[in-house]
């Protein structure tokens, strides 16, 4: 029986998940888990990429010890961050995190040289201050001159494992430098940030085979035989592939550190409404586009849990939140102040004081403020999607860690007036594995793969609670409009 391994690394943790098809169902095992996080070093928030690679090998050793002698492997991580590689094939610095404050005003600075309209028309990508375009705009110019290749994080990991350098196109689209329709880097934008297309490896689609690990690794670690496949390397792209897609007019919410809400299209949408609402057209796998908005996610809850010294589990925090009345305060969760504050609890409380609202004090009140306002923000975005697409979204498929937060899922269903299907929580790893299975010929296509997902995992169904919170979305929208002036 073939074994497939998903290396799935997020901003706060990583894991190696092993998947196999048994009697038409996908069985998953977590083989290794490890922490992740940036650290302040040499004046910037940076990722320890060498540590992440070492953890991958530790996981592969566990897989070998468990009796798996030959596996397929795919890698996905968060988007936008990159590694600068010199002519000797080594990294020039530890990669800087998208949460680093160096790009806080970069959109305003760069768009004095090239218009927002040009950038959006060319790339179709949402304006976010941490996009690769703005990171490179702030990059050390002397370092860029020494750079032979600019590699996105998962491409760099694949390069270290196999010695083969590629640029996977779905993740490349998140840079805000890839032309929307041609699928090539836009030379005008590259020039504005002092790089050239030669500094990127060949663009490839998900499903491209990189091949075996470098022989050197087998002398250092006890490893199975590994065949590396380039999957949809942005974790959200993999998560969408791993979404069951219930409903006729469906949308998805990949709910993790970030929330990514949108729908899947065959043709990109970069018209006036999409530009006004700052929606993105990221490339997906197999000729699709992920039309979505990247907004705040469970990062706020993760910070609060940490600031409470991890004395509560996430399920315990959700229980405490359930004892509190929702919508006691309105919060624009997408405000930049919540991206990387010194203390999230204090930042939420300060926001409520500044806006003249009830200040949450207890852990339950703070968590309810987060969950209820995330639900409001999701509902608000669904109403925008309705307007842009010209039809009512009737179903929201929630995948990722947030699919386990029943309280938030029910609030979202009720406020947005949509059916919510929650799960699987491991959609990213599942989508990663599904691309590998399609590449190997074990699954015919994504459509059949999604049917396998529906049959293999417990998907919870939430329906709107009629008559509850009927005015709260309109009130929240008024609050946001007033705040934005």
Q: Residue spans of the language-model regions?
A:
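N-terminal glycine/serine-rich phosphate-binding loop of ATP-dependent small-molecule kinases
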Residues: 1-93, 146, 218-228, 416-418, ...
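Active-site core segments that coordinate phosphate-bearing ligands/cofactors
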Residues: 6, 18, 111-123, 137-152, ...
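Short beta-strand-loop/turn "lid" adjacent to the catalytic site in phosphate-handling enzymes
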Residues: 41, 61-97, 126-130, 158-179, ...
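Short, well-ordered amphipathic alpha-helical segments that serve as non-catalytic structural scaffolds
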Residues: 51-64, 182-188, 377-384
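Short glycine-rich phosphate-binding loop at a beta-alpha junction
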Residues: 69-77, 149, 202, 391-400
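Glycine-rich beta-strand-to-loop/alpha-helix junction loops that act as flexible
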Residues: 76-81, 206, 255-258, 395-403
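Carbohydrate-associated surface elements
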Residues: 100
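A charged, well-structured terminal subsegment
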Residues: 131-137
């Amino acid at each position: 029986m073939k074994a497939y391994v998903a290396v799935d690394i997020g901003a706060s943790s990583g894991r190696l998940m092993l998947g196999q098809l048994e009697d038409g169902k996908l069985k998953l095992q977590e083989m290794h888990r490890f922490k992740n996080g940036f650290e302040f070093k040499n004046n910037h928030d940076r990722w320890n990429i060498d540590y992440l690679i070492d953890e991958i090998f530790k996981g592969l050793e566990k897989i070998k010890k468990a009796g798996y002698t030959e596996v397929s492997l795919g890698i996905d991580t968060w988007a936008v961050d990159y590694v600068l590689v010199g002519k000797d094939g080594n990294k020039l610095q530890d990669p800087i995190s998208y949460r680093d404050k160096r790009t806080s005003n970069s959109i305003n600075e760069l768009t004095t040289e090239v218009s927002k309209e040009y950038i959006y028309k060319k790339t179709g990508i949402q304006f976010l201050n941490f996009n690769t375009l703005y990171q490179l705009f702030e990059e050390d110019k002397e370092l860029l001159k020494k750079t032979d290749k600019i590699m996105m994080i998962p491409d760099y990991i694949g390069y270290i494992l196999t010695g083969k350098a590629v640029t996977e196109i779905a993740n490349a689209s998140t840079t805000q430098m890839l032309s929307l329709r041609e699928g090539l880097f836009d030379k005008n934008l590259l020039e504005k940030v002092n790089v050239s297309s030669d500094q990127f490896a060949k663009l490839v689609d998900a499903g491209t085979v990189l091949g075996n690990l470098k022989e050197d690794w087998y002398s250092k670690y006890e490893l199975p035989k590994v065949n590396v496949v380039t999957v949809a390397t942005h974790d959200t792209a993999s998560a969408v592939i791993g979404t069951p897609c219930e409903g006729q007019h469906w949308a998805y919410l990949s709910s993790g550190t970030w929330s990514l809400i949108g729908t899947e299209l065959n043709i990109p949408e970069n018209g006036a409404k999409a530009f006004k609402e700052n929606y993105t057209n990221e490339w997906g796998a197999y000729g699709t586009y992920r039309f979505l908005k990247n907004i705040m996610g469970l990062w706020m809850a993760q910070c609060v849990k940490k600031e409470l010294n991890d004395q509560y589990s996430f399920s315990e925090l959700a229980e405490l939140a359930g004892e509190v009345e929702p919508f006691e305060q309105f919060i624009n969760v997408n405000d930049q102040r919540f991206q990387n504050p010194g203390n999230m609890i204090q930042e939420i409380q300060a926001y409520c004081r500044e806006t003249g609202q009830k200040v949450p004090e207890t852990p339950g009140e703070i968590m309810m403020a987060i969950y209820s306002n995330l639900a409001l923000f999701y509902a608000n975005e669904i109403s925008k999607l309705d307007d842009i697409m010209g039809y009512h979204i009737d179903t929201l498929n929630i995948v990722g860690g947030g699919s386990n937060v029943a309280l938030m899922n029910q609030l979202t269903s009720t406020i947005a007036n949509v059916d919510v299907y929650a799960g699987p929580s491991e959609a990213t790893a599942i989508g990663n594995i599904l691309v590998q299975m399609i590449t190997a010929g074990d699954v015919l296509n994504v459509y059949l793969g999604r049917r396998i997902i529906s049959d293999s995992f417990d998907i919870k169904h939430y329906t709107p609670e009629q008559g509850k919170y009927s005015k709260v979305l309109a009130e929240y929208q008024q609050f946001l409009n007033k705040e934005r002036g």
